[in-house]
Amino acid sequence: MKHAILSALFLLAASPMIPAEKPSWRQATDAELASLLPARAPVVKEHIETELRTASGIVNGHGRYIAGIVLITAGYSADGKYSHYLVVQAPIRIGGVPLKPGEYVFGYTHSGDVLTVHFNEASTGALVGTADAHLIAGSSRVASLRIWPPGEKALIQIGRFGIPYELSEK
């Protein structure tokens, strides 16, 4: 009995030394995305309609999401500036652009085999950074937005183009 108690105490004392397992990421379900993403996204001073069937995202074991959805911008001042709304609940670097937890919008300009994607804060419209999306090699289905889990591709797909991303521990 003493031996069992001593063993238990040792394991409790040693547990902070055992590194915590990194939370694994998986594709978010349609129901999860519907409960997370707004039907009307707050963009600067407007609430712009979104299209739920275009939603895509990933979620980790702690319930933190990286998710996005297409904006229906026709008739709004954002028309031509932004095409997608993005919710970030864990730090991420997309094509070299660091995004801390928050809400963002992004749009792009198309030039040949490259999309130049500009990321902006959703609440202010302030530019956070730009990144290039390149044609995805091989045959890939075209998607208005797809956020691939990091175990598969670590890629944000816009149409036939992709931007690599890295999740941050901080």
Which residue stretches match the model-derived regions?
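Primarily secretory-pathway and cell-envelope proteins
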Residues: 18-76, 126-170
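Sec-dependent N-terminal signal peptides
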Residues: 4-13
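Generic detection of intrinsically disordered/low-complexity segments and helix-coil linkers/edges
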Residues: 4-5, 19, 98
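Mid-length scaffold segments of soluble, non-membrane domains
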Residues: 73-124
